[in-house]
A protein has these predicted regions:
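Short helix-boundary/capping micro-motifs
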Residues: 12-28
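Conserved amphipathic alpha-helical core elements
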Residues: 41-42, 263
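A short LG(V/I)-centered, amphipathic sequence patch enriched
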Residues: 42-59
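C-terminal regulatory
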Residues: 141, 155-281
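Short helix-loop hinge/linker segments at domain boundaries
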Residues: 54-57, 64, 75-100
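A late-sequence structural motif
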Residues: 268-306
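Central regulatory/effector-binding core of bacterial HTH transcription factors
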Residues: 96-162
């Protein structure tokens, strides 16, 4: 028996949401239609793909094995449709369709949000669906067309994915003038041990600050005393303005505070080495990266960062 892409899509969505009703909402179909498609698929493969109880649903071992094939098939079918749309758009003179885009929360709010409206205005038949998240998403599983991610190098290669650098991000040490008047201005990194320091924190972050100097052959590591952590750089910036200590921040998060002299830079001769990286990189599956609308967005964002 031939299995349709619609049937596979229903299976993939139930696996994603672990809910028939959730899959129905995602596909715009009633629960009965989703259940019928999943039952049809199980009959075709002659095995149970989900274990069911009155309270929950879960993939069986066979279902987990089949999911990878189903995801790839659904993605390939969707990509083929999108490529046909792109071909039509190229011949009709305009971009159309949807770009499902994800980006880091802070960079997305502070930088990306300033640039996207003009791109949407430039292409009135194009739709952008933006998800701001610091989680590394599974592009195929979550049907993401383009992911903007932190990376430690301009070419952040990942197996099976295409990538292009979008922008560079400068990380800097900053403090409020009032704090420095009270606590003194550090001249060497080792002096940070005597200061209150603040960290833009994410999972796996710690209180060891690593930095490079043009005159130093090796990076140095300074263990700092951090009284304030936050997973949002704007929050750390506000605490720094209030005089809570010295902060390590991405430059875009404190541009206005530096211009107004609410903050000043310290240790300017030293370059931070962060776990976030110093680049924003566009990542997509090779098929998605070849789409005309995705290519257009990547080129546009690179031009804005130039």
């Amino acid at each position: 028996m031939t299995v349709s892409v619609d049937t596979l899509s229903a299976f993939v969505e139930v696996a994603k949401h672990l809910s028939v009703s959730g899959a129905g909402k995602a596909l715009g179909l009633p629960k009965s239609a989703i259940s019928k498609r999943v039952a049809s698929l199980e009959a075709s493969v002659e095995t149970t793909l989900f274990s069911r109880s009155t309270r929950k649903i879960a993939l069986t071992s066979a279902g987990e094995l089949y999911l990878d094939f189903a995801q790839r098939t659904v993605l390939q079918a969707a990509t083929a449709i999108e490529n046909v749309k792109d071909l039509h758009a190229n011949t009709s003179g305009g971009l159309s369709g949807k770009i499902r885009l994800t980006a880091p929360v802070s960079w997305g709010q502070q930088v990306l949000a300033r640039h996207l409206p003009a791109f949407v205005t430039l292409h009135p038949q194009l739709e952008i669906e933006l998800q701001l998240s610091d989680r590394t998403m599974d592009l195929a599983y979550e049907r993401i067309d383009l992911a903007l991610r932190w990376s430690s190098s301009p070419l952040h290669g990942l197996p099976g994915l295409s990538s292009e650098q979008i922008a560079s991000v400068d990380w800097i040490y900053v403090a409020a003038p009032d704090y420095l008047a009270r606590a003194g201005t550090p001249v060497l990194p080792q002096a940070l041990a005597d200061h209150s320091c603040m960290c833009y924190w994410q999972e796996n972050a710690d209180d060891a600050w690593v930095m490079l100097n043009n005159r130093a052959a090796e990076p140095i590591c300074v263990r700092v005393s951090s009284r304030f952590h936050a997973n949002n750089p704007e929050t750390v910036c506000l605490a720094t303005i209030a005089g809570c200590g010295i902060a390590l921040l991405p430059g875009y998060a404190c541009t206005q505070a530096l211009k107004s002299r609410k903050l000043v830079r310290v240790l300017r001769d030293w370059t931070p080495v962060t776990k976030f990286g110093t680049h924003i990189t566009a990542v997509a599956t090779p098929e998605r990266m070849r789409m005309a609308r995705v290519r257009a967005l990547v080129a546009y964002l690179r031009a804005q960062a130039a």
